[in-house]
A protein has these predicted regions:
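Residue-level signal for pocket-adjacent positions within structured domains
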Residues: 262, 535-537
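Sec-dependent signal peptide recognition
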Residues: 3-11, 528-533
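N-terminal signal peptide
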Residues: 12-26, 538-542
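Extended, alpha-helix-rich binding/interface surfaces that flank or overlap catalytic cores
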Residues: 188
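C-terminal GPI-anchoring signal of eukaryotic secretory precursors
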Residues: 511-530
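Positively charged n-region of N-terminal signal peptides that target proteins for export
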Residues: 1-5, 541-542
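Compositionally biased non-globular segments, especially hydrophobic aliphatic-rich helices
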Residues: 8, 47-49, 521
Length: 542
């Protein structure tokens, strides 16, 4: 018992969880204004009105950001680079019908924060949407960004919006640009489509519905394409909608997916180490009636995949045990893989002062998991002071060497590695004793589509995992490795990495949805030092 306790204690003390993002969209949004005369059709316009579609284009106006001069020049340049990466992703994902130039007679009417702007916005810019980024020193702690649309065209599509970025964003972490790109994808989606103020302008009149689920009144999106792709993803033919977030108060509720069933999608209200762009979010773009959508990133979303209607309708944990072991956990601080098998982490549970009856899953009514997931316990990736999501198996930066020799476990971080549960220890390593404890380990894999098996590298040894997964022994090692099912990790051609890196770096022609015909192509969570002290004292007395 002491050995196991010491193992978890060392893990806990070596890695800190620094999730601090909370979206502030609903705190700044105002009902957008329709401008019937905002589109200019003239002989100089390269986008004369017709019925064809083209990749969405952005006019980014940095005038206000440069005028305010908040943050360092390095930070402002960092933001510009991240925005360029972000709009490239949207250019691959979305097409809009051609229009003329966009002319906004009163750009400052977009927000009281906008006092300076490019004069061409008033005369007309030959783009599909105008976006004004602003570094804002007034955003509250934990809110890294917020965004909103402000003007709509005569066909109700957003044509101007702004995004606020926290002056104190930690942009010097190793993979900070990837994280900010993820953040900008989220915020700009609020400008383009995902806002309860925009739902009123969708092509369908009944975008949302209200139902009681597990004793709680919920608001759900029920548009046709969302229902279709969600039914396929979850394996539930009778699905009636996808829930919107009901927690977090102003800023989160109503304009985000419910994290309990959409954890890992980029449109939940808080950051998570496996943010991807799901088919379900892409379907919302299509259902608006404003966009033609490329669905190539959606296969990367795996939370709740194939779990059936029960996943949508029942609780995550019953009588202290997870109802869905791939997606929820039930043992506090257990070293585990996150649900997409991309990150190493631990089962997040804690003691609250009190919990509502419908969020009580354990014998101790105060025990719960992560608040944004309806207090369900989920696996959270490790982070460090210098690296976002350092537990990632593709490009993580965890210094485990202080704990043990990684080669003894066949561990490998690479572009094609995933996280796999394993108790394997090299039988020739006399420095380690075998206790049978299962750990989250990174292993390089190859998906074999011909027979739906997975080749897993364990040190110099390669094993073949069967289609349905399961426990396997490995020559030269004590213990077993728990192979994941083929369909869980190999269903997408870009089966490793998140949708951001896939969108930026991995877009072979065969991965593009043929129907798209693309052209060239909050809750703030920080560990309190008191909790750490209690944790240490607990293990000292085991």
């Amino acid at each position: 018992m002491k050995t196991k306790a010491l193992y978890y204690l060392i893990l806990f003390l070596n890695f800190s969880l620094l999730f601090s993002f909370k979206c502030g969209h609903d705190k700044i949004k105002k009902p957008p204004k329709i401008l019937n005369d905002s589109i200019i059709i003239d002989d100089d316009s390269t986008r004369k009105l017709d019925d064809s579609y083209h990749s969405i284009s952005f006019f980014i106006d940095y005038t206000q950001m440069n005028y305010n001069a908040y943050g360092t020049s390095d930070y402002r340049n960092f933001i510009k680079d991240s925005i360029n990466s972000t709009i490239k992703v949207f250019g691959e994902l979305l097409k809009v019908k051609r229009s003329g130039k966009i002319s906004i007679s009163n750009p400052a009417g977009c927000s009281e924060r906008i006092t300076r702007y490019d004069s061409s916005i008033k005369t007309g810019v030959d783009y599909d949407i105008i976006l004004i980024p602003i570094i804002d020193p007034t955003l509250e702690d934990g809110v890294d960004a917020a965004a909103s649309a402000c003007y709509l065209s005569s066909d109700n599509r957003p044509i101007m919006g702004y995004v606020l970025l926290n002056q104190n964003y930690s942009y010097k972490k190793t993979n900070a640009q990837q994280f900010l790109t993820m953040l900008l994808l989220h915020e700009i989606t609020h400008v383009l489509v995902f806002s309860d103020d925009l739902f009123d302008y969708f092509q369908y009149s009944d975008v949302t519905t209200t139902q009681t689920i597990n004793g709680i009144s919920r608001t759900l999106i029920q548009t046709p394409k969302v229902l279709s792709v969600a039914s396929q993803h979850f394996g539930c033919s009778s699905i009636t909608g996808i829930e919107l977030e009901n927690q977090g108060g102003e800023g989160s509720a109503g304009s985000h997916w419910e994290a309990r069933i959409m954890l890992g999608d980029y449109m939940i209200s808080t950051d998570y180490p496996e943010i991807v762009i799901s088919d379900i979010s892409l379907a919302l773009f299509e259902d608006s009636g404003w966009y033609q959508v490329n669905y190539y990133t959606g296969g990367l979303f795996r939370f709740g995949k194939g779990q059936g209607c029960k996943f949508l309708e029942s609780t995550c944990v019953s009588s202290g045990e997870s109802n869905f072991e791939w997606d929820f956990c039930d043992e506090s601080y257990e070293n585990k893989c996150t649900s997409n098998n991309l990150n190493r982490g631990f089962c997040y549970m804690r003691i609250y002062s009190s919990l509502p009856a419908y969020y009580q899953y354990f014998s101790d009514s105060r025990t719960g998991g992560w608040e944004p997931v309806d207090y369900c316990p989920v696996t959270m990736s490790y982070s460090s002071s210098s690296y976002y999501f350092s537990g990632n198996c593709i490009n993580g930066e965890i210094d485990d060497t202080k704990i043990y020799n990684l080669s003894s476990f066949g561990f490998k971080i690479s572009d094609s590695s995933i996280c796999i549960q394993s108790s394997l220890i090299n039988s020739n390593d006399n420095s380690l004793s075998y206790y049978g404890y299962e750990r989250a380990m990174c292993h390089k894999i190859t998906c074999n589509s011909s027979d739906k098996t997975i080749s897993v590298d364990i040190g110099e040894t390669v094993i073949e995992c069967p289609t349905d997964g399961g426990y396997m022994e490995v020559d030269g090692y004590n213990g077993t490795i728990r192979c994941p099912p083929y369909d869980r990790v190999c269903t997408s051609k870009t089966y490793v990495g998140d949708s951001i890196s896939a969108a930026l770096n991995h877009i072979p022609n065969e991965d593009i949805d043929s129907s798209y015909k693309a052209s060239s192509g909050s809750i703030t969570m920080k560990f309190n030092r008191i909790i750490i002290s209690i944790f240490i004292l607990f293990f000292l007395y085991i």
